[in-house]
Each structure stands twice: as structure tokens, then as C-alpha cells.
């Protein structure tokens, strides 16, 4: 083992946070220092030259002050027996840099803790420090650097074992059931005993684990398929049968329902843009459908929030890629329901400490780490996350604590699939059965069974085993392979594909072949495996992530292998399909057969469950709101996380990657997160796309579970109504059902809710639910001081509505317009004046639930509402729109005011006499902004179908206050700024806790600046002029290399921008250059694209750069290219970071900075204002002096120059091309106007001759106007950033 000391690992503010956390438990620890250590293992000694290269590879990141270690050592390394994603990526980089002997690189952090007087730490002090410096699920703490050797332990393979039921009978299997955490029901134990006794042999542990996973509640949805007896009466339908009823009645435009990894909905002819067989990008017109899927990953997120949420997102992404015979994930959504946060120093009056078991994370920890995990996975994979929800609930109801100690972690999204690939093909006997993606690793074992149990019912070690770890960069590589396959059209080598999820390949391979009506033979030792010490059971059933299984014809294997080799994606042929419907797994190492059984035994019909349950009546007190003060109510409600500003959850997630996003969460010139709907685009030459929106009203279930289901659907519809949809029948719903099955009364309430949705409301609305998921163990049980405790979730239906949208430009937002003359606000009150407060945010912040819930009494009114909004939008008569939901009418109107930075004058007299109920009820409805001149006509039109439900409630005001009257009586007045600060305080507190507190404070204080003009555009060129037109007309299209490395994800939108500007864009992978397949001499220019090359290990872009600098062929290629006189290049984001590290071989780039971690120490996805500076850059010719918004998405964008002199020389030589400015146009280092803190706002540079330029923001994601989150009225099809690409075409001539 080679040990190499690295740089300081933690910034001062991170160290301070740890020391502050120790003040209560270990105040004597007054000093802490952390530094990286790297450990390398090789199969032969490294030469001196190789050792020098290794040292340079492992020198990365920002400059931070280092110190001599002092104090007691705590070495934090990955848990022995695991391989971290960092390790696999860093090892790849070393090998690509020519150090082939490297077997593994790993990284640890050495913490040195000291007391003021230098005395040794006590055991209690050590115990207090350890949980603050490591994640016990993924890391371990040791006391010596030599302990890192434990990471590289090669064990002999563990043997197969059997369970002796032939002599031990049922008792033997029951003991194994408990010991292995199989979660088998008594009926399933009997079923297995019967079948194996019939076979005359004992089952292997491999077969039992495989059976348990394949037949777990998680995988087989036993409760949803069960027979039901309620209050002694047998029910005619199962829960799933009632859901299927919606599709049976309204199957229109649904291509696949309930039969694949995602549901497929009919699309239309679309021009898709991708690289063709020769590598050149082009448009291909084909029939393209969209697919929809929403999953949950609740149990793993409770145990290890970052990893659990990350792999939840990753698993759902795989579902979208493994549909049909290969598909493309496109855009995502994320949601969280947790118990109360208890933010330190920000305790809220409705929060009470009900305790929690030690084994699970607190709600606060889940909301600090979980969203980061989900966002990090989406970001690195390259899927924009553009919708979500966040709910907290922990309250006493009917003598019980109801809440989300077991959280909901929702992950979903949309994708696209070619019509020709929508169905899985037959698998002929002899076809190769392939595992694509990462290796088997001992993680996630038994996750399917574990997630089917109540939290706390499993043993702690098994809970640890059932959590997975994610490597999104590897999943990206696997998706690139899938993309190359489906892009071959009819020559797609993939016959059928499944993702590997719960149960690992022991579930995925049987599903793959069983669905095709064939069997299979496998060789266990051909499974790609990096932990040779695993037992056969562990190899077959582990839930290592980033894996797919697929069938490929033998004759297509060479083509498939060629694609995988180019994408550097591991794959293994593990078996072949057989005519006999039998599953056989052989093990050549031990010479035995761990699995040999008919598929009908594994996946046949184990005994069907019967649920015999009772209704339970609960006495619920009314919510007494008679003494509530409206000002206090506003302050409380606006701080409730379900209502409050969710910026801290949104800006950590990339929302612009792909260039296919028309509407994300952030709205208007001030980027306020209040959008009702997410909208994507179908391509780069269309305005058609997909819309999706979430509905969720779980607290109502504590009063009336069926009402909560109806209201969730209603909310999804009132949200998605903000997009332009041709017909309500085009809506397709995903239903995610969470329930504490077995809790008194809850099963019957679940049945009633499914019936209300599946048999009544959806049929009345004419819409269907073709996809969904259930999680039936939403209860946490534990013991505390010998007292049994429990926190039980309410029945929770999360509905996601999806639909094709006819024109993404017609999406309405809540931003009130104050620049379009005299306007009015209309409320459409679908509650028809009932003003019920049960289950509301208001009730919750006063510690109550109430006993009367809002409901959907009239499906026709909901349909009329939807149709009316669509008609008015189509006709251009609506200026703003926002649905009424959490926080009631009050939250609706103040959010609209926040987005428009305006005051309001409202009169609520027509809505009822009870001002509290009027303002805070959460009945369905929406507020519309219309022109005053249109008011009478629109009101009359709405009244024809919504009689008595339409109210004029006021108008935007020229002052800065929110003023609400009831006729002549003033009932509420407060400044918009004060309310906005209250609404944003929760997000500020979370950012302050999680990120750099200085940045959090700057963003929060931005709200105080009433002169902030917001995003704007000041252009010094004609946006409508196409300066490349003459050159395009000549017919000449220069060749442009669209360069990517493994983990890059922004290449397609970059190619589209250069294609539009008159280039022929070619897909060039670094593997093409290193292998000699492609040479840069054949291209006029190249662009290095954005993403996460090598997952940003060894510094963002640095691994990519070093694989060029230390690979002789690559270095020669790039050096020759840069030294040509006619070449040019652009580096954006990750490509910018990479090229900045090549400055030694780029003429004129000597003063370029190094790009390091953002000052916030967080990934920042923002719309930022930039100014183009006067420079020699060919890309910015004629643009100097322009100011305009641009997409930003990076974690390491701080421009770190060698020294102040180098920065000054770069500026003096006019090498700085772009800088961040604030909303008044001044260069800035203030967050978030400058999202990374770069000195003087510097974010783009060029060389002395202007041919090579680098920039951190993303012009390729916003070259069309429709791609902008906000833009001025009047821009046409092209946005201003297309000028950059056209300048490059003009440069060539």
C-alpha cells in the first residue's frame, strides 16, 4: 500500500460547525484539523516516473491553509468490504494516465482533534466526535493510517449453504427466515416447504433469498393484489383491480400500462436529435412516445438519507431507461414527507419532541442530506429535476402521534421512447443474457424485504445491509450504451431490458426471461464482481446499483461489445436463454448449482393474501380558530415547510441540462420558487412537450382518507392546468400509495380511498392511472426507557399528473404582471364557499387537525374549471395563474406578489364572513390575473359553467404592502418584504445549517433590497440578426467535434447549438482519441462539454485534463490542435474546468485560473446575470457591453488565479470575457448574483488571439428563447446566446 498525504479537507466554516456541535457534549475539544490521505494498491512496484504521475494526479482542489497535524487521529475511510464510487473513478483516471499497474485508489480523511491543554480525549469525547465526522452507513473510523490496509482485503469466496427442511421441517425455515431477514409470511413458508419437499431436496440460501426478494411486498404488491374482507363483508375487487378500472374505462393514448418499468403514453411525430451511425449529429423524424414513472425509496432514506435518496433517484432513472427495448430519461421530480424539523435555534410553536429510534435519521438530517443525495445523483447523471413537494407532519391525532419518522422519498420523471422500441421483443432460446453497468458489491442485500417491514421491526445489521450506495457517473455510461443502441433504430441490438433494483439480479434476470416465456442458465462466476469474498447468495442477490440486465442476440454481441468499449461501460455475458422455463445458476468455483428451480415455483402463484379488516371510528375535536390573530397566523403558516420557500431544495439541483426545459420551479425576474407545473420540450425544433405536476394532501387522511385521495387528484389537476393541454382526457396519473398497513382502521381507510379514486372520481373525470407504486409499512416503532413508542404516517396518496402540452410557451406562472396596465385578480373557488379548515396548514401550526376536511364534491366543476382555464390560456387572456393549496388563499396571493414584487389590495367580502376560514381554507381553486378590460367578459364566461364560484378579489397595488379588507373593514396589512422574509426564513435556516452561512445570509438579505430590478436584458447587438446566414447559405458546414469524457452529460444540447449555427457536429468520445479512432486534425474546432467527467473526483475537470496531459497520444493530439493557426475551441462548465487545467499546452492561456469549489460549498443551479466584456474572443465578437441572463449549474466554479498579479495580468490583457453582475448591472462577488464567489465576478476567459475560450455558464442550454426560465417579452425563436455559436461560424468564413 502506498500512502500519500493530500491537502486540507475541510474549510474553516465546516470545521467551526463541527466544533459548535461538540460544545454541548465535548466542550474540551477546541481544535480540529482535517486532511485528505490517499491510498494506492498496485500489482507491481511503480516506477519513479509513475510515482511522480500519481502524485500529480492526486494534487487537486482549492488552495487551503495546511497545518502540521496535532492531536488524536480519527481516520475516516469507506467501510472495509466496500468500494467507494470515488475509488472506482479515481482508479479509472490513473489507468487512463498510463499507470496500468494501479489496482485501486482510495481516499480517506484524517481528522486530528485536540483539547486546549493537550490532554488525551476521553472515550465519551471520542464517541461524541465520531458521528459528526462520518456516515456510519458508508464509512468507518480508525485510529491509525495503517488501518487503511483493511480496505484492500481479498477474501476467499464464501461457500453456499442450505437450510435443512427435510429433517428440520418448518422450524428450520422459520429460523432462517428470521436470521436472513427474509420477511416470509407463514403462507409462504408453507408454500416453500411443500415445493422443496416435492423436489426431494433442501433449498439453498441463494434460492431462499431470491424467492424472498421476488415475492416481497416491495416487489409483488401483495396488499394491493389481496382479497379484502371489510367489516365482515367480502369485497368484489382488489385494490389493484380498482386502479386498473381507470385504465379499462379510459385506455385512450396509453400504450403500456402496468406491464413494464414505466408507463408509456402516445406521443407523435417528432424530430429527435442525436448522433447517427457515423457519429454525426442529425435530426431523425420518428414516432416518439413519452414515458412516466414515480417511485419511492422510503426505508433506505430513513436509514442513510444521502445514499437512500441518491439511489432512489438512480433506480427511478434506470426504470425510465429500461422500458421497452431501450428508452431515454428526460426530466425528474423529487418529493419528501418527514416529521417536524426542529431546526436548532428556530424552534416552531407546533413542534414537540416525540423522540425517535437511534437507527433512523432525524427529520432534520433527512432534509439536510436526503435532498443533496437525490440532487447529486440527478445532477451527475444529467437529468434536470424540475418539480417536487415537501411536507412536514408530526402531530397528535385521536390519541396517537401521526407523522413521518419513516419518510416518504419520492423520485419520478418523464422520458421518451421511440414507438418501435415501446414493446419488449421475444427472447429466442440461445440469446445472450447480459449484465450491463457496475460490479456486484456487498450492499443493499435484502433491501426489497427490508423495505417491506415497519421501520424498527428489522435488526440493525440487516438495516445497514439493505442500504445501497450510488455511482451516477457509471449509470450515465450505461445509459449512453442504451442510447447508442436505440439510436440504431431497427438495428437496435437490445431485445429486452430490465433495470436491477430490489433483489438485485436474482430478481431482474428471472423477470426478464419469465416475461418472454423462456428459462435461463447462468454462470455465477461470470457476474461482474469486485468483491471475490462474497458468498453465492451475496453475489446473486446484492443490490449494487447502476446495473441493467438485457437480452441480446448472439450475432449482435460484437456490435454491443464495441459500443460498451467506446463508452467504457463494463458488461458481462452471464447466461443464455433456454426453451425450458427453468432457472439454473451454476458455480464453477465450487462445482455446484446454487439455483435449480422452475420459474413457476419462483414467480408462480404463492398463496394469495386475504386482508380481513375493520373500520375504526375516531372522535376528532373541531379546530377552534376563533381566537387566532391573522398576523400571527401569517407568520406561522409562512414558516411551515409545506408552505414556505423551498429554494434550499431547488438550487442544489440542475434544472437546465439537456436544453429541453421550458418551465422549472423558479419563476420570473426574481426567480421565486412558486411554479405550479414542470414543462419539457420534445426537441430543439418544436414547442410541443410534456407537462407534469404533483398533488398531495395527506394530512386530510387523518380526518377523511377518501377525501385526501380526491383532493390529491384535484390538486394535481389544478397544478397541471397552468400548462396548455388539449383535453382533460390527455391527463395520465401516477398514484403512489403509502399506508401503515395493519394499523387499526388504516387498511379499511386505504380500501375506501382507492375505491374513491379508482371507481368514482377518475371515471367521472375521464382520466386513468396507468402507473403507480405502493409502500405499505409506513410506521416506526421503538422502545425508549422501557416504553413502547410509535409514530404512524397517515394514508398518503401522492398523485403526479402527466400530459402532452401543445405549446410550452403558453405555460402560465404565478408571477403577477405590473407592466401590462390595469389588471384584476379572480378567485375560482371550487369549494363553493364551504371554507373547511380541517387538515390545513393553519390547523397544523396551531397543533390541531380538525374534523371536517375539504373534498371534491363535484367532479363536473373540476372539469369545467380545467376546460375554462385552458380556453382562456389558449386565447391569451390570462396573465398569471396560481392554484390554491397549502396555506390557502393567503399563501396563493402572497406567493404571486412575491414572484411579481408587488403589493396587493384585496377585498374578500364576497367569500364569507369568517376571515380566518376564507384566507386559510385549502379547498380546490385558483387565482387568475386578467386585464381589467377583459374582466366582465371573462367573469361572464366563467359563470356559465362555474356559477357562484367566481369572485373578483382585488388587484396588484403600486405600494409594497399586502392589504386585505372585508368590505370597509381592514382585516390584514403587512409589508410584502416582511412577509417574504417570513416565507423565506425556513429555507435560510436550512441553508445556513447546510452551506456556507455567509452565503445564506447574503441571499436572505437580498429580500431587503426593494430596488432589485431582477433579471433583465441589455443587448448591444440585434437579437434577430443571423450573422451566420450567408455562410450557411453557401452550403459549407465545417466539422465541429463535440467532445466528451465519461460522465459528461451536456453534449447533445451543445451539438444542437452548433448545428443551428451552421456546423456539422460530431460526437467524439475521449476513448476515440486515445484509441486513435478519431483525430482532432479532421475538425475545424472542438467544444469540451459540461457534466461530471469521472464524477468530479480529483477536482472538477482535473481528471479529464490529466488523462490528456499524462496520456502520450492524447497529449500529442491536443498539443497539435492548439498549435494550428486555424483551429478554435470552447470549454463550457466541466469543459471549462478541464481546459483551464490544460493551460500549459494552450498558447496564450498562461494566466488562466484554476476553477475550484464554490464559496457556498454547494452545487449551484441558478439563472445568473452576466456581462460580456471587450475581449479578443471570437465567440463574443460584437457582443461587448451586453448584459443578459444565462443558466449556471456547477459545484466548482470559483476562479482561483495563481496569485493577484496573474488575475491582474489576465484583466489587463483583456482575456476576461464574462463576469457576473448584480441586477443593477454592476460586477459582483455577492451571492447568489455571483453563484460561486469568483473575484470580480470573473466567469469566462480567452487567449490572447481569442481562438480558445472557456466559460462556466451554459449558453448551449438557452440558445432558444423557450429554454429560458425567464425572458423579456418580444424575443423570438432565438435567444441572444445563439450569437456566440454564429460568431464561431462567421470566424471560419
UniProtKB/Swiss-Prot annotation:
The UniProt entry's GO CC annotations, sorted and at most eight, read: cytoplasm
Q: Which GO terms describe its biological process?
A: 'de novo' IMP biosynthetic process
Q: PROSITE patterns under this entry? A: GATASE_TYPE_1 (PS51273)
Q: Which residues bind ATP?
A: 308-319, 675, 885
Q: Which reaction does it catalyse?
A: N(2)-formyl-N(1)-(5-phospho-beta-D-ribosyl)glycinamide + L-glutamine + ATP + H2O = 2-formamido-N(1)-(5-O-phospho-beta-D-ribosyl)acetamidine + L-glutamate + ADP + phosphate + H(+)
**Which pathway does it serve?**
Purine metabolism; IMP biosynthesis via de novo pathway; 5-amino-1-(5-phospho-D-ribosyl)imidazole from N(2)-formyl-N(1)-(5-phospho-D-ribosyl)glycinamide: step 1/2
List the CDD domains hit by this protein, alphabetically: GATase1_FGAR_AT (cd01740), PurL_repeat1 (cd02203), PurL_repeat2 (cd02204)
Keyword Chaperone applies: no
- The superkingdom of the source organism is Bacteria
What UniProt keywords apply to this chain's record, in alphabetical order? ATP-binding, Cytoplasm, Glutamine amidotransferase, Ligase, Magnesium, Metal-binding, Nucleotide-binding, Purine biosynthesis
Pfam families in alphabetical order? AIRS_C (PF02769), FGAR-AT_linker (PF18072), FGAR-AT_N (PF18076), FGAR-AT_PurM_N-like (PF22689), GATase_5 (PF13507)
GO molecular function annotations of the record: ATP binding; metal ion binding; phosphoribosylformylglycinamidine synthase activity
| Compartment(s) of residence | Cytoplasm
Q: Where is the active site?
A: 1133, 1258, 1260
| This enzyme's EC code(s) | 6.3.5.3
Question: Where is Mg(2+) annotated to bind?
Answer: 676, 715, 719, 883
Supply the SUPFAM superfamilies for this chain.
Class I glutamine amidotransferase-like, FGAM synthase PurL, linker domain, PurM C-terminal domain-like, PurM N-terminal domain-like, PurS-like
Function of the molecule: Phosphoribosylformylglycinamidine synthase involved in the purines biosynthetic pathway. Catalyzes the ATP-dependent conversion of formylglycinamide ribonucleotide (FGAR) and glutamine to yield formylglycinamidine ribonucleotide (FGAM) and glutamate.
As for family, the record states: In the N-terminal section; belongs to the FGAMS family.
The subunit structure is: Monomer.
| Listed name of the protein | Phosphoribosylformylglycinamidine synthase
Species, as recorded:
Methylobacillus flagellatus (strain ATCC 51484 / DSM 6875 / VKM B-1610 / KT)
Gene symbol here is purL
